[in-house]
């Protein structure tokens, strides 16, 4: 009997694999036996992630998925998939009264349009196998109402709705769709946040997390759960991961 978290023989697409959660997810998924297709915009960092993958048969495809024409070409390069981990995305910390249309379009193109139309393209081209699993990486921002996150939180809330609908529309093909919604995780983004504000403010924010900030491993392990047979009876779920913050 195979282990319920074993991904051997499965092919998983991981977007945003050049850094942070996407990078760790790609590495962790390969450690569980999967063949991984990794995507990111920076070819050098993508190659570095590729060098860290365990096993053989992996594929790296550099592309900016926020651009429609690029998405179509990207989908055409993909093999049949057993799962997708949508880890790519951008953040924006900016007061509501100063938000503009350019910011809105850029954030929604990366955080909503890219995962939506990549998933649609993969499904319509029959590259998403029956029984596959889709995982969207959202955020606690829609739940927490964090100041300065109006555009970002809206984009991540959209993923909740999309995932929930896909859970019903794709159930006939036994394709599952779920979200993971992390709080602050110790990635390059958090390090940049500390420089943007101050280490003292970061410490104050972390104190709001009963279990402290998370690590990329924490989120990657949850994504593996949703990609693996262990969660075969779970779909349409949004898993909040924030160490008790909300």
Predicted features along the sequence, with ranges:
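Short C-terminal tail/terminal secondary-structure segment
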Residues: 2-3, 144, 224, 235-246
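Conserved glycine-rich cofactor-binding loop
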Residues: 18-19
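Substrate-binding pocket helix/loop in short-chain dehydrogenase/reductase
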Residues: 95-96, 100-108, 201, 205
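Active-site helix of classical SDR
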Residues: 119, 155, 163
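Alpha-helical segment proximal to the catalytic Tyr-Lys
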Residues: 124, 168-172, 232
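Residue(s) in the substrate-gating loop at a strand-loop-helix junction
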Residues: 139
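A conserved structural motif in NAD(P)-dependent oxidoreductases
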Residues: 208-219
